[in-house]
Amino acid sequence: MEFRVKNGKKNKKNTLRFMACTAAVMVVCAGTTVWDSWRVAGTAYAAAAQETSAGADAAVVQAPTFDPARFVLPDLAKVLVAVEGTGGSTCKVYAYEKIDGVWKLKVTSDGYLGANGMSNHRHSGDKTTPIGVFCMNTPFGLKDAQAGFPSNYVKVDSSYVWSDISNTLEKDSSGRQAGERVGEEKYKGYYDYVIDAGFNTQGILGQGSALFLHCAVSWETSSSGCVAIEEEKMAEILKLYGAYGDGACYMALAPA
């Protein structure tokens, strides 16, 4: 899915949500910025976020390892979904829960991401998955909620659209609003269960649209930029999200 901002206007609600979540506000790696250390592997989006939300609680990358200690998150963070790019469009996904101050591994899954791999210079239509740390939001899907799912999980149908204007999920019974009709039959399998990762919530022109964590299908080996994992594991992550709710669940994406 790709995002277009009409007339270059930013969405106020998304701006506030971005500031509240403070995704990848300050990024450092062994005393230097990840932008300096990982210029090839990349974290440009996180560096841009630093300029936008300076002074808020920070999500910091400390060391080049997928140990969750690498990611220093706001105190309110209780769930971390770490996406490790393993070459091309393949990835490993690890979901951790913070229990008594210690990150515990709860879910692991193979997965796939953008057809052109990971990028620190993502732009609309390039089929890459952005690198960075983001605050997850908006759980939804074509299937009914399971016990333990977030209370704000939305079962979507064809009247729901991921809006091109607001970059959020909206009800549009008129069918006139521009965007992706996420509840249509063609998304069965893919969008059975979904969480928005929180990428480009400010609607920066040209950066691309929503970054979804959604279900993988057997006939695909890559996406347009989203991260796809096994449906069973997707449901487990939704239950972790449900235990804490909005603002407590983060996604971190980077190459191995």
What does each of the following model-derived ranges do?
Residues M1-S53:
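Gram-positive cell-envelope targeting signals
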Residues I229:
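A conserved hydrophobic position in a structured secondary element of the catalytic/binding core
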